[in-house]
Amino acid sequence: MSEKSFFEKTGPYKLKILSDHINGKLNSIENSDILIDDISSLKNAKDREITFFSNLAYKKDLKETLAAACVISEVNADLAPKGMPLILCDDPYMGFALISQKFYPKELKTDHLTGQKNNITNNI
């Protein structure tokens, strides 16, 4: 999410719920109950956040990520850090986009685009 302050956040979600949401498959049933609080990039992810991997140019970031889990294709699953909980799916980019929408489904609305007491005159 490029600017989270514009969207209402939901969650946390169990990893199994996120996997089911994108028709993915967990690499281990033992990972089903892991709680995920948010989404992030490989490089910026923290514990309890989920990320994704779909581009081989980011192999180094995948190896170094601190994410709690990763959405990844079965073909690339061996590149993930050993023991990392994975959601396996055909299109990790699309899967992560769907997970992003689950965490941030609603745009925040505001009643005012400017301050209520602003007074704009000819001289501004």
What are these regions (language model features)?
Residues 1-124:
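Domain-scale signature associated with acetyltransferase and cell-envelope carbohydrate enzymes
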